[in-house]
């Protein structure tokens, strides 16, 4: 396919056009008074959503150059979503506004590298300021936990209170998962037996939920082994039995590679529900953790050389089972069945054994690792069961529950800051003392200072108000706890009004926006594919769309 190189003012103009499109479309969803956006689908009616991340992914311009720029800007929202699971709308607003302002300065003849350096200098100052503004969230104050979740869930108090209830049940380090409820229309919290460990899927081809890039297995069998699996022959008998059963298979091994991994992937693509992860931990600790998982899931054996049991002799009765397993690129969560007495007895026996080891151990390090294992086995898993009247309602509500859960975890991890966009607005004042090494570097610093007010401007605009007056009043009061509550239409104390944001979400949104915007700011040219003649002839615009490169 032929392509063309676009640079100079034509490229800068395209940057500004696309950035303005993203700002107006994604920004329209921001805040409690944000709007919904309809996204057309290849089949059925359009999806109507207020999720900024979905809207960002739904923007697909016709012009190849614009499409390439949108894809690059979308990386900011995607990275923000991957890192913290929330803040994608704020990130998109910051990214697009930074690109617009920088592009104007570059078009005026200023040096792009100096501008980028100024932006990077400002970034370091702002990140420190956000950290200094944050305060720890207390798990004793469940109303604060609930409020963070309510804001992220677009004001849904039921979601906020349910997440606070789940956090209360499992604690700060506890595991909370989300699943769709069968039969119920309500949002329920259920405490069940389970475990989470920090190992992700060994191949993205195992993914069952492409939108969330996760593996979700219901009622799977579990094969647990200390061995490294690199040939498929020993696995064939159990794979055949799994295929006949119609249930998924989840493999935990030292590693799965070579022929074994490629064969599992091929069978997954052909319809077999299968996934594999590396075993958690290292050395003797890994062996003990695998025994913990075997107890939790009811597996008869952890397959190892010392047992003398061959993999090809395994039957389904030898494997473990679970209610469900969810795997992301970083973590695995196993939810067991509470009704299984044998499993519960084995888990209790392991818990008592670990407690005895803690009492007799003389090593502080060993005690710490034993306590970690104890917490994983005894802490349980809180399951948020999402119900609704229709499948569409359940899906939309589940998305909001997951966003709110991510925000709550971020708040517990790094604390909270005043919400409503004021954290970034107030942080901008720290740039007044920052000295640039050149006038063009100062332009970069000034761009960041201006862009930091973009989120609150958009929130106020969506409420139908004039932002200049509100921002001027907030700054003059010199009170960093003062916010403008766009829902109640009044000035208020952030904590009293419950308008708070997780510091981690604000930090990641800003940091990611700077990273992606800087990449585009320093882009001199873009190489884009020309549409082929067949596509062009069949388009409504015909060949005329290419005239003067207007098709870009």
From Swiss-Prot:
Keywords, alphabetical: ATP-binding, Chaperone, Cytoplasm, Isomerase, Nucleotide-binding
CDD domains named in the record: GroEL (cd03344)
Keyword Cell wall biogenesis/degradation on entry: no
Broad class of enzyme this protein falls into: isomerase
Main location as per UniProt: cytoplasm
Domain of life where this protein originates: Bacteria
Family the entry assigns: Belongs to the chaperonin (HSP60) family.
Function recorded in the entry: Together with its co-chaperonin GroES, plays an essential role in assisting protein folding. The GroEL-GroES system forms a nano-cage that allows encapsulation of the non-native substrate proteins and provides a physical environment optimized to promote and accelerate protein folding.
PANTHER family referenced in this protein's UniProt entry, alphabetically: 60 KDA HEAT SHOCK PROTEIN, MITOCHONDRIAL
Subunit and partners: Forms a cylinder of 14 subunits composed of two heptameric rings stacked back-to-back. Interacts with the co-chaperonin GroES.
Protein name: Chaperonin GroEL
Chain's gene name: groEL
